[in-house]
């Protein structure tokens, strides 16, 4: 293991120890308050696994049954509490996602300071590591992000098998994986024969997604459900346009995602030169990240305030690792200044001290 890799893992270890020691650890009931209806749905799927759920579940949640169902089977085989098992898998997934990102950045020969900054930006984001440790039932989000990172890496390596593996993982976790297929189609239409995917591969990607979706549809069609599927999907796409909200309410709604993306924006001002949108080669990879991230962030916005609410922060953060990778590998960086470097780390530590997801309470008065 070379010096840069050792340093990266040492920094990751230090950051994670700090988070593990200072994080909130909600019990089941608390996690439902701060994690929303998704967690209850996933728990019920696990509870009744290997059989079908007897409790009503929202169809859109039931379609993501695969991993909660698998966790339920594992919990019964090894006699481990479902909630505890989810938290164990959250720890594992956080480490795995970090490993993928470190290995990916090392391929680009990224300066050690910027690898450290990337680990800080990822893990001190209160809506990434802290959130999922505190609310472990929303594990499907982490699995989705892992799958998207695998797809990003596959495009860099031009590895089709790896891409389909990542797509399957993401599709089993969330219907949002459709964004991966659309992004690939977009690249193919733009680049035509200059893209290593042919139209058959694009068709296969949509077929894979559709097959996984139909598995979820089959599960959700054989259990009691809350609400109707058509109504949920209609609101998912058109919710924002059928709401009657004041300008102030909508303004606050659109500001919420900045609670997750704030440090990344500040990083851009502090460490990236003026040619912000300069793309260094890897056109396919960069187009994919841009289209994918746009679709992922746009979807919870379309749902509207009544459905998404503060969940817009969590749902928009599904694109956070992809955007982080884009900003680390592309724009030309400013020369590292020790004061600026330490100032930013301090800022991220403060930003990470979320009064809900950490043991720190000094930011309680600025919650909104």
Locate the predicted segments by residue:
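Aromatic- and kink-enriched transmembrane "portal" helix at the membrane-lumen/periplasm boundary
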Residues: 65, 83, 87, 94, ...
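Perimembrane helix-loop-helix junctions
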Residues: 3, 180-207, 277-279
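Short hydrophobic/aromatic helix or loop-helix immediately within or flanking a transmembrane segment
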Residues: 39-47, 57-80
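Transmembrane-helix motifs of polytopic, lipid-linked glycan transferases
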Residues: 88-109
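Membrane-lumen/periplasm interface segments of specific transmembrane helices
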Residues: 21-22, 197-275, 289-297
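Membrane-interface alpha helices of multi-pass inner-membrane proteins
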Residues: 148-149, 161-175, 180-186, 207-211
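Specific aromatic-rich, kink-prone transmembrane helix
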Residues: 140-162, 166, 322-326
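Transmembrane signal-anchor helices characteristic of membrane glycosylation enzymes that use polyprenol
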Residues: 6-35, 207-220, 296-298, 345-354
């Amino acid at each position: 293991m070379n010096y840069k890799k050792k340093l990266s893992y040492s920094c990751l270890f230090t950051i994670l120890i700090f988070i593990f020691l200072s994080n909130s650890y909600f019990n089941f009931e608390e996690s439902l308050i701060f994690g929303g209806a998704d967690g209850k749905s996933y728990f019920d799927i696990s509870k009744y696994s290997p059989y079908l759920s007897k409790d009503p579940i929202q169809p859109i949640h039931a379609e993501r049954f695969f991993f909660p169902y698998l966790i339920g089977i594992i919990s019964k085989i090894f006699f481990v509490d479902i909630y505890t098992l989810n938290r164990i898998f959250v720890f594992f997934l956080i480490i795995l996602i970090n490993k993928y990102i470190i290995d990916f950045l090392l391929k680009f020969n990224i300066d050690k300071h910027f690898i450290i900054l990337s680990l800080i930006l990822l893990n001190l984001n209160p809506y990434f590591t802290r959130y999922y440790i505190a609310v472990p039932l929303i594990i499907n989000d982490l699995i989705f992000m892992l799958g998207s990172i695998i797809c990003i890496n596959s495009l860099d390596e031009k590895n089709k098998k790896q891409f389909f593996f990542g797509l399957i993982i993401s599709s089993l976790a969330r219907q949002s994986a459709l964004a991966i297929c659309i992004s690939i189609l977009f690249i193919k239409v733009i680049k035509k024969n200059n893209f290593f995917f042919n139209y058959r591969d694009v068709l296969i990607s949509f077929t894979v997604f559709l097959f996984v979706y139909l598995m979820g549809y089959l599960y959700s069609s054989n259990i009691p459900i809350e609400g109707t599927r058509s109504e949920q999907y209609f609101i998912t796409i058109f919710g924002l346009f059928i709401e009657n909200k004041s300008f102030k309410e909508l303004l606050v709604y659109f500001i919420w995602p900045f609670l997750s993306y704030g440090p990344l924006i500040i990083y851009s001002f502090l460490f990236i030169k003026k040619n912000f949108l300069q793309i260094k080669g890897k056109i396919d990879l960069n187009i994919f990240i841009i289209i994918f991230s746009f679709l992922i962030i746009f979807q919870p916005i379309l749902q509207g305030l009544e459905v998404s609410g503060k969940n817009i922060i969590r749902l928009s953060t599904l694109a956070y690792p992809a955007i982080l990778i884009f900003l680390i590998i592309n724009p030309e960086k400013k020369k590292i200044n020790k004061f600026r470097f330490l100032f930013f780390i301090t800022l991220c530590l403060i930003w990470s001290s979320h009064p809900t997801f950490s043991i720190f309470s000094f930011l309680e008065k600025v919650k909104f």
